């Protein structure tokens, strides 16, 4: 009698634990979303440095304006190459609608043990099909994000939080976006002209992809303006 009871307990545990992990993972992400939503209206000054083969782009400046619940506008008076991934990879953007969360365990990143959570947005009209958030549970901050777009391309972002006030709303002071894009078809929003790089051109990837990165510094946050 005891042995069958033990088997039933083990089976029940095997079923309930993954469900509990998924629930806890989603609850964690919802907590982060609520912190970001509590920021209210804000602006920030941006510095952008773009590294794309075959193109030489000067460091640019822009202004970011956020209006609840999830409207982000980036403008620049001069030259600006602003990848749309800079807003798509925001935790608030990824978590703004309904989503499924899958607990993928933990992963070490720059000396930190991060909770790895895969999310699948319920809204199929968005550009992001699936994303993985690497969460620092002790600080309740997303340190890294990887995402797959409808085009099949993979994008990754690393985030730093040096501004204490901004970090309290899970907003970064620095973000580095790395991606692969089709050769000669760099996705961008441009104001002004750009110059072809004077550096020797790198060999074209046989898979038809070009590696690119964008560094963004977020400065002079203004909340509740």
Regions found by a protein language model. Give the residues of each.
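Flexible, processing/modification-adjacent segments and terminal tails
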Residues: 22-41, 45-51, 55-58, 65-141, ...
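Sec/Tat signal peptide C-region and signal peptidase I cleavage site
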Residues: 16-21
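Gly/Pro-enriched, hydrophobic low-complexity segments
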Residues: 113-225
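Sec-dependent N-terminal signal peptides
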Residues: 4-13
């Amino acid at each position: 009698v005891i042995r069958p009871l033990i088997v039933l307990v083990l089976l029940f545990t095997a079923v309930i634990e993954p469900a509990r992990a998924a629930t806890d993972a989603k609850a964690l992400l919802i907590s982060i979303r609520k912190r970001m939503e509590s920021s209210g209206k804000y602006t920030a000054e941006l510095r952008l440095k773009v590294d794309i083969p075959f193109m030489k782009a000067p460091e640019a400046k822009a202004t970011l304006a956020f209006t609840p619940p999830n409207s982000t506008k980036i403008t620049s008076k001069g030259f600006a190459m602003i990848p749309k991934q800079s807003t798509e990879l925001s935790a608030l953007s990824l978590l703004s609608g309904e989503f499924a969360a899958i607990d993928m365990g933990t992963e070490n990143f720059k000396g930190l043990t991060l909770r790895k959570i895969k999310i699948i947005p319920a809204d199929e009209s968005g550009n992001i099909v699936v994303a993985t958030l690497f969460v620092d549970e002790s600080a309740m901050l997303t340190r890294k994000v990887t995402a797959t777009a409808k085009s099949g391309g993979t994008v990754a972002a690393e985030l730093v939080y040096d501004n204490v006030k901004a970090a309290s709303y899970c907003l970064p002071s620095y973000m580095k976006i790395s991606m692969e894009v089709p050769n000669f078809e760099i996705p961008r929003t441009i104001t002004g002209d750009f110059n072809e790089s004077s550096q020797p051109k790198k060999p074209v990837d046989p898979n038809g992809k070009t590696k690119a990165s964008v560094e963004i510094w977020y400065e002079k946050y203004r909340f509740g303006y």
